[in-house]
Amino acid sequence: KPKLVPVPSTNIIPERDVDKRPILECRHLGIDFGGLTAVDDFNMAIGRTEIAGLIGPNGAGKTTVFNLLTKVYQPTRGTVMIDGRDTAGKTTIQVSHMGVARTFQNIRLFGNLTVEDNVKVGLHEHIKYSALSGILRLPSYWKKEREAHEKALELLSIFDMQDMAGYQAGSLPYGAQRRLEIVRALATKPSLLLLDEPAAGMNPSE
């Protein structure tokens, strides 16, 4: 059974967590696959500025919990609250629009796109232009494209990847692909970021 443990960290904006509702709360969460119970009676609450780790042996259900939180799976029982809002009946896209982003145990990048374009996929919710502007390449289109380019490079620089912006994502070393997946998740400006084994495949320096 997976277990939630606190991770020592610096709370950079602690005042937001005082007498505030948690950004994520699970109550008695569970799911059955046929006659097999994969997760049962899972409870947790995470504050807006907290960092927590979900630990457990292989097969304990950690990734299944992530899939329940992001609605890849619909729970058999229990509730998931995001910033005080019930996610019952929500789709994966709707949960994403509620401010939840995640990475995957198995990398899910667009390998044929450039590193920069992968980041722009995460930016699309926040940098918009009309279909007409895009088709006719109007000034508003180019303005938004410049904004997306600058923001993508800014995010890539967090992981020292700005010089890789023009590389094909699928050609990157495994550890760099892991970092790119995190950058793409950050591009969505999430309120809650879920990282499924983010350090897998990275060397100690990474």
Segments the model singles out, each with a brief description of its role:
Residues 1-206:
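Glycine-rich phosphate-binding loops of nucleotide-dependent enzymes
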